[in-house]
UniProtKB/Swiss-Prot annotation:
Protein known as: Deazaflavin-dependent nitroreductase
Stated consequence of mutating residue 142 to A/L: Loss of PA-824 reductase activity
Entry EC no(s): 1.-.-.-, 1.1.98.-
Family indicated by similarity: Belongs to the F420H(2)-dependent quinone reductase family.
Membrane topology: Peripheral membrane protein
Compartments where found: Cell membrane
Result after altering residue 79 to L: Loss of PA-824 reductase activity
Source organism (scientific name): Mycobacterium tuberculosis (strain ATCC 25618 / H37Rv)
Catalytic activity: oxidized coenzyme F420-(gamma-L-Glu)(n) + a quinol + H(+) = reduced coenzyme F420-(gamma-L-Glu)(n) + a quinone
Keyword Cell membrane: yes
Residues at which coenzyme F420-(gamma-Glu)n binds: 54-56, 60-65, 76-79, 87-91, 133
InterPro entries, per database record: F420H2_quin_Rdtase, Split_barrel_FMN-bd
Gene name of the record: ddn
Matching SUPFAM superfamilies: FMN-binding split barrel
Length: 151
């Protein structure tokens, strides 16, 4: 049974906040080439994930915490533990071709859900990197997807 999430988590206010904070962080990231402000948040490295909007066909950019595993980039579709998956996750399910920017490096990758074995490997690493992921999982009935982006 999930813990009680923050009251605003599944409200339109939360979506508005996430949208605008993502835009601000993306702007800072690009302005600084992922160095310093914008390139990390709470001392955790940030990458920019670009998906194609499933309805608009337009590029959609989201700053996300990430892990590297060789040529792979691993991200969690947490949306802060909200009831629904983030829009970027729905976009990559419709079109798995993504671009990931890590500092000045831009990678053209293909995204997919982690296998059960990969999930068992990556989830503990994600939680070690950002312990709030464990809280996020406790706030929702959905299993937070782990996305593997690979060449």
């Amino acid at each position: 049974m999930p813990k009680s999430p923050p009251r605003f988590l599944n409200s339109p206010l939360s979506d508005f906040f996430i949208k605008w904070m993502s835009r601000i962080n993306t702007w800072m990231y690009r302005r600084n080439d992922g160095e310093g402000l914008g390139g990390t948040f709470q001392k955790i490295p940030v990458a920019l994930l670009t998906t194609t909007g499933r309805k608009t066909g337009q590029p959609r950019v989201n700053p996300l915490y990430f892990l590297r595993d060789g040529g792979r980039v691993i991200v969690a579709a947490s949306k802060g533990g909200a009831e629904k998956n983030p829009m970027w996750y729905l976009n990559l399910k419709a079109n798995p071709k993504v671009q990931v920017q890590i500092k000045k490096e831009v990678l053209d990758l293909t995204a997919r859900d982690a296998t059960d074995e990969e999930r068992a490997e990556y989830w503990p690493q994600l939680v070690t990197m950002y312990p709030s992921y464990q809280d996020y999982q406790s706030w929702t009935d959905r299993t937070i997807p782990i996305v593997v982006c690979e060449p």
